[in-house]
């Protein structure tokens, strides 16, 4: 039976779940995740304790509980459950209060209840920009892009662009490199004024073939030799043009995005 892990939060639980994933990924073990968001009352806290204790009895072992509960009373209630409770706020906020000699706001859901803030608006603008400039569908306002990702079809440009926009508020456009570009031996014309914003994504040809076969099985588009040709040409072009690039083959979207931000010296826009 898989160990049970509860993600308990007074908000969406995204922060707690992200932290839990980072910690649990260090162990060669699968876990059963139970998400318990929006614990914004004493009654809900007691109900959560009942769920945790039921899981302990059913599993025959204590669950693991990651919490980001700001309300002190609710937090103490959950801590009385039959579980290993890992309190993120107490572990990190209290030492920071002492170090900074400041009192934290202790406001529930502060991280994600930000629809009226400039940071939130920046993120929404970035998402809209990335959607409008996906796969080269628009050349308008490319000068406003923070970064323009280039690469062959299905090399990871779209998910990376959207992740940069959603997570960091970065205006990320993406533009495909196609066989016609390789025949000319030049970057697509609309990209010429924006060379300083370009960053390339490549991928292993066989992995690219697998991905394309899911979309167009048996086609020339997905054939290994065609994928090999496109990747070789794309990488050669990026080297000629002095465009920084990386292989997305064995990297997560998070790793790709972080590398791009570091390579182009772009500071995170949202926090």
From Swiss-Prot:
Signal peptide: none annotated. One of its GO terms (molecular function) is protein serine/threonine kinase activity. InterPro entries: Kinase-pyrophosphorylase, PSRP. Its EC number is 2.7.11.33, 2.7.4.28. ADP binds at residues 151-158. Keywords: Kinase, Nucleotide-binding, Serine/threonine-protein kinase, Transferase. Pfam families: Kinase-PPPase (PF03618). It is an enzyme of class 2 (transferase). It comes from the Bacteria. It catalyses: [pyruvate, water dikinase] + ADP = [pyruvate, water dikinase]-phosphate + AMP + H(+); [pyruvate, water dikinase]-phosphate + phosphate + H(+) = [pyruvate, water dikinase] + diphosphate. NCBIfam families: PRK05339.1 (NF003742). Bifunctional serine/threonine kinase and phosphorylase involved in the regulation of the phosphoenolpyruvate synthase (PEPS) by catalyzing its phosphorylation/dephosphorylation. Belongs to the pyruvate, phosphate/water dikinase regulatory protein family. PSRP subfamily. This is Putative phosphoenolpyruvate synthase regulatory protein. It comes from Burkholderia mallei (strain ATCC 23344).
